[in-house]
């Protein structure tokens, strides 16, 4: 039986085919992305540089001599490659288990195409089993948590974690996310929220799923 890491690697290696040469690209964060950076580094493909969403990804890119650039230095990105904690059939996602979802949304929005890579366990019919990360300003944490509680969620502070921007993460369990776009907007309207981990406005254009049968390329289904 194929292990989860092997499935992640299968998806990551397939994703290299979606990277155009001589362009700037965006790189996400997480264990599946670590496999992708390794595969890209070993592929021999030449890119102008990569905008990274985390220190860990930047360090790994440097190991493979892939130039890391700031988003402020480029006018746009050809493609953004990232993983997901959950992804549905419309390629809407929950992300942010690693706490980098604000940076990830910024870089995704600057990219012409979003390619999501994941193992098959992340492909779900409905979002919400994975707790939803919400980045909050520390002084508003209790206020935001009460609002999230009123929405039907069970907020829990991520103890000992601070985001790249110095904020806190509240992980919300039990939310009804049958309308991801509406829920994403509703949470972001709460004063004190910087960003939440629903990627509906910035849904993926392509999903590469690592399965027992190999890599499957999936496009959004709105039905």
Swiss-Prot record:
InterPro entries from the UniProt entry: NagB/RpiA_transferase-like (IPR037171), Ribose5P_isomerase_typA_subgr (IPR020672), Ribose5P_isomerase_type_A (IPR004788)
Residues binding substrate: 29-32, 82-85, 95-98, 122
Keywords (A to Z) from UniProt: Isomerase
Active site, per annotation: 104
EC number: 5.3.1.6
Assembly and interaction partners: Homodimer.
Name recorded for this polypeptide: Ribose-5-phosphate isomerase A
Organism of derivation: Neisseria meningitidis serogroup C / serotype 2a (strain ATCC 700532 / DSM 15464 / FAM18)
Gene name as annotated: rpiA
